[in-house]
Amino acid sequence: MIGVEPDIAQLVADTLGLKLRLEPTSWENLFRSVDSGQYDIGFSNITVTEERKDKYDFANYRVDTIAFEVRKDSAIQVRQPKDIAGRKVAVGSGTNQEQILLRWDVQNKAAGLPPVQFQYYTNTADYYLALQSGRVDIYVGPNPTAAYHSAVSGDTKIVGQVSGGGEIAAQIAGMTKKGSGLVQPVADALNELIKNGKYAEVLARWNLANEAVPASVVNP
């Protein structure tokens, strides 16, 4: 696995003197597996929300940014809700991105604009195949995924970004089961990495320096 999430997870494990075992999983299974104790912690661009804090503990490590990605030859720009009206938009089911887009869609329909045509797929590869084939106009996902894909593939571009909290700033965090006792050591490790510069090196490697946080806190 490659990306900012496994890189951060590895640094945290190294700082705590733990051996990291990375396991890829679906978005839905991630939460169930943390609930059951199969996974100790989730690092998967998880947005901190008040609802999630009822069941989980969080140690933040990035500002949450959502990206709108289109084909390289597309003239679409996304700056406000009306820019997605009537578009075919691919987004992950049950994600924070979806919740923001659903609110935008309600707002657009109330203004008499055409509804968004939402499309859902099983994995990221399917989303990008749909985008490249023209079955969708826009893919909406985590900024790190979009930034990496657009840079490596050369076939797409980012045409808009918004906070993962919608109208308010949101945080990305490592997620543990509520009361497990792991979240404070994780936050302490992240703060050590922020101090020694290794955290900044990882974000710079993935072109995400603008998503840095000055400190990690528990349940921000």
Identify the residue ranges that each predicted region occupies.
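Extracytoplasmic small-molecule ligand-binding "clamshell" domains
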Residues: 1-45, 205
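Extended ligand-binding regions for polar small-molecule ligands
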Residues: 6-15, 74, 82-83, 87-88, ...
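Alpha-to-beta junction loops
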Residues: 17-19, 36-44, 87-88, 116, ...
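Short helix-initiation/N-cap motifs at beta->coil->alpha
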Residues: 21-32, 76, 116-129
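Periplasmic-binding protein-like
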Residues: 63-70, 151-191, 208-220
